[in-house]
Amino acid sequence: SIKVQEMGEKLAELNDKYLRLYSEYENYRKRTNLEKADLLINGSREMMKAILPVIDDFERALAATEDEGVKLIYNKMLKILEQKGLKAMEVKGEKFDENLHEAITRIPAAEEAMKGTVVDVVEKGYYLNDKVLRYAKVVVAF
């Protein structure tokens, strides 16, 4: 009968609308979860980046003092930051790598084997969760 056929068509139409809405909702949910995760990661990144100059100042202060209290505070702060994924780059003596280092200046190499090697670090570089947070500013032998 025509009535049953109309009901069948209406049911198919409503089912189609339902599936589309459900699909849209799932996509929205996934997108907002990704945005939230991205916000947390980038917020953490920006916070860590803002703290790096404080770490630099702390290290300069440590070089000028023998105060054990200052050393304890520095070590405690560094340990917390490391637990959050911060890691200093160890680059002195390594081959220069433009993906990790920023060459501030170049000096003549004392020997052939030293060419292209980082001979001094002007400003430490850091990783955050194994991604470069700040490039190491270095002096390279040529």
Identify the role of each PLM range.
Residues 2-99:
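Charge-dense, E/K-rich amphipathic alpha-helical interfaces
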Residues 12, 98, 114, 131-132:
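Short flexible coil/turn linkers enriched for glycine and charged/polar residues
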Residues 88-90, 105-106, 120, 140:
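Structural signal for conserved beta-strand scaffold positions within catalytic alpha/beta enzyme cores
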Residues 94, 111, 121:
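Short, conserved loop-to-beta-strand elements that form functional interface hotspots
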Residues 98-113, 117:
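Non-DNA-binding regulatory cores of transcription-related proteins
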Residues 117-142:
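A hydrophobic membrane-anchoring alpha-helix module
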